[in-house]
Regions:
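Active-site histidine-anchored catalytic micro-motif
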Residues: 1-39, 43-57, 92, 96-151
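Surface-exposed loop and adjacent secondary-structure segments within mature catalytic domains
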Residues: 70-98
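A glycine-rich helix N-cap at a beta->alpha junction
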Residues: 59-73
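Short, hinge-like loop/turn segments at secondary-structure boundaries
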Residues: 56-59, 86-88
Length: 151
């Protein structure tokens, strides 16, 4: 039986000077015979959330996979602490190597996708978080009992 996962990530692949490790993890998971990736959610971290979505969507399309990608909201969990971190300053201006892909307006948010998918696969799903935990925190806000559905 394949292990069901959601990957929550801040992939900088496709951004000149960005870190590629999240994308390597995504590629390994998407091509593993032991893993079923139910979806990918993006969070602000190494790059702005919109850039992370574009990078993840581009990667999924290049690998010819039918995996949904959902974007989180820009910013951090605590809006009072939503200032740029020093190491992130200037990343918005980084040269984009891959094309920019914009999410559909009616697409579910990352936190809603996480909450719904975990409930629909109660006890059989694992969250693979390789970025800040903003989307997971917001999903727990949406459903405080969500942790009971995650393996």
């Amino acid at each position: 039986m394949k292990k069901k996962i959601i990957i929550d990530t801040d992939p900088a692949m496709g951004t000149k000077g960005g870190d590629p490790e999240d994308c390597f993890a995504i590629m390994l998971a998407l091509n593993s015979p032991e893993i079923e990736v139910l979806g990918i959610t993006t969070v602000q971290g190494n790059v702005p959330v919109e850039r992370g979505y574009s990078n993840a969507k581009f990667l999924v399309e290049e690998l010819n996979k039918e995996i949904p990608v959902h974007t989180g909201k820009p910013g951090t969990y605590d809006e009072k602490r939503n200032s740029k971190r020093l190491w992130l300053a200037g990343r918005e201006e980084m040269e984009q190597i891959t094309p920019m892909i914009v999410p559909l307006e009616n697409e579910a948010s990352a936190e809603s996708f996480i909450a719904k998918t975990c409930k629909n696969n109660s006890g059989d799903i694992e969250l693979v978080t390789i970025g800040p935990l903003t989307n997971v925190a917001k999903a727990l806000d949406e459903d405080p009992n969500l942790n009971k559905h995650i393996n």
